[in-house]
Amino acid sequence: MFNKTLLGLTVGALMFTAGSAVAAEYKIDKEGQHAFIEFRIKHLGYSWLYGSFNDFDGSFTFDEKNPAADKVNVVINTNSVDTNHAERDKHLRSKEFLNVGKFPQATFTSTEVKKNAEGYTVVGNLTLNGVTKPVTLESKLTGQGNDPWGGYRAGFEANGNIKLKDFNITTDLGPASQEVELILSVEGVRAK
């Protein structure tokens, strides 16, 4: 579950790439819940279990006219996994899932950004639990413009799915719990 969460965070980072007229660099604004990386996985096939990574950092570039030039980079502290249940979180941090003692960070680095009818497809490499695999996120620009403090911001939402076994997370959670859905929302502040 935690591995899925990490993947979700990585996917979220990828989605943070989106557009302005010139390729501008944005720093992800984590303060005040302006950005989050969440995940969900089926619990016994009956309901959803939600979680998040509370400690991450990243940046993205955004050029509305040339999405192919966009980049997304995110680093996630895997120890920050949070499902609002201390014992489960401890288990997720263990060798059976995220193995945070050996792999304290997960990273996402985009390799391709393409415009589509709904927004942007962001493809990148997610490194989680010591394994690097390509991940695809579907992203939408939620808005952009000047903020009240003299800065310029752009926001994106994204989602994608990862398979636990792809990242060497082999604990059997049942047939309904083999994939983790990543849910990302990011707001970036443009560098001055």
Swiss-Prot record:
One of its GO terms (cellular component) is periplasmic space. Residues 1-23 form the signal peptide. Keywords: Periplasm, Signal. It is found in: Periplasm. SUPFAM superfamilies: YceI-like. PANTHER family: PROTEIN YCEI. Belongs to the UPF0312 family. Type 1 subfamily. This is UPF0312 protein YE1254. It comes from Yersinia enterocolitica serotype O:8 / biotype 1B (strain NCTC 13174 / 8081).
